[in-house]
Amino acid sequence: MIKVYVSRFNSETDSEPHLECYEIEKTPQMKVLDALQAINEKYDADISFRSSCRAGQCGSCGILFKGNGALACQKEIMDGAIIEPLNFPVIKDLIVDKSSIEAKVKDLELSLQCDHKCSELNTSITKEDTQDTKKVRSCIECYSCLSTCPVVNIATEEFGGPYLMRYIDKFETDPRENFDRLKEALDEGLYKCTSCGKCLAVCPKNINTFGDAIEKMRAIAVANGSGPLPEHVAFKENILKNGRSVTTDKTPFIEQIENYKGSKIAFFTGCMVDYKFPEIGQMLVDVLKENGIDIDVPEGQVCCGSPLLRTGQTDIVQDLVDKNKEVFKDYDTIITICSGCGATLKNNHPEFGSKLHVMDISEFLVDKLDTEKLKDIDMTVTYHDPCHLGRGQGIKDAPRKIIEMIPGITFNEMKYPCQCCGAGGGIKSGKPEIAMDLAKSKAEMVKETDADAVITICPFCELNIRDGLDAIGCENIKVMHLLELLTKSYE
């Protein structure tokens, strides 16, 4: 027997929704849709929900499963599951009113508008011509992405969300389209996406809305002078001056460190560690030394290009990739301690002709850590999954395993550890009010765990979560890089 919690609400009789618990027998590979039907049959519960094809093709059975968008016919039920309606006005139980998004689509005239342009096409359209638009055309309108997007949930009127961005891009990249779709994208908040990747994670058709739609439209905006945001221009200017997307009044970490010539393991510092947080770079060197590992920190390395790729300023990215490829070509393994850098090196650099063996510090250390040297730390901690580590690199277990190896630590998981903190996608610099709202939401989750510190593996996340905790009056809760926690245990 398993327990399943279902949100119940009738707009005609109830003032607010509530969860009801049901116990049912779980059959092998039982889906949420099967569970809802079993509950209705056993309890005569009359739970209202939509369904049709049962094959993941119609999108009608979209729901929230443990807080994330999903198809009821595809998601396997589990003990303790919470089933809620999508984030739209609720009509009854799991049935929602989608008229607002349907009206938006109608207002934007989101259908092919080719006018006279079609008649002027003198050549046939090839597969290559439609390659970009095909990547985003398989949407089944389940609205899982809209209900899961962190920005939509806190700024509904400001950001059209991944569903509309994908829809607009479908026509922006269609060679027959004659409307100015880019203006629509800008009006709907093209630069208000954090690049968290949650929409891809919940999409039953694996549509990469940020990578294949938003990021590309941002590049088009830059090319025609409509972008980037003024606050993003400095990224490129700084890189052209010193190879880093940020400035510093400190001595860069690379200039401070003694290199271990001959080591086949290298450290890709990233801009933030080299210029803003050199102490974290030193912690990496010290922790590895405790484990008998020498690491080289080669000179000549430059920004990974992530700030440029995320904001559409792509024209000098190839040069950055080539420089880093040359610097790191003779190393067997490249270590990163910034999730954004790691994701960019792994996922974007191969598109520019560079494929290095890159590992996040947690995946590198998890099976090498000398636990006998670790000393007790009397501390309660929680962990924040950086978007570009958890979803961008698929690394979730390794950091937690390392934390739990440290004696004396009490680990409390927060409600939604993988919810975006608001630091990415150029949001913290370009739309700081959105970044702050998301940071405060994350900070509240941290507060609920009664943790002394929140651990993460991203300098950008560290900064934004710190701002969020300060904003809600939790200055006493520390924000620590995983390496800082390990350093404390090795002292």
Model regions: which residues?
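Iron-sulfur-cluster electron-transfer modules
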Residues: 133, 141, 168-302, 306-353
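Short strand-turn-strand beta-turns centered on an Asx-Gly dipeptide
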Residues: 7, 24-25, 64-68
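Eukaryote-biased recognition of intrinsically disordered, low-complexity regulatory segments
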Residues: 1-22
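Short cysteine clusters
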Residues: 53, 58-61, 73, 139-145, ...
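Immediate flanking context of iron-sulfur cluster ligation sites
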Residues: 37-70, 126-139, 180-197, 290-300, ...
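Ferredoxin-type iron-sulfur electron-transfer modules in oxidoreductases and energy-metabolism complexes
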Residues: 30-42, 84-242, 319, 365, ...
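Cofactor-cradling patches in redox/metallo enzymes
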Residues: 73, 272-357, 388-491
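Short, structural beta-strand-to-alpha-helix junction motif
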Residues: 27-35, 76, 252
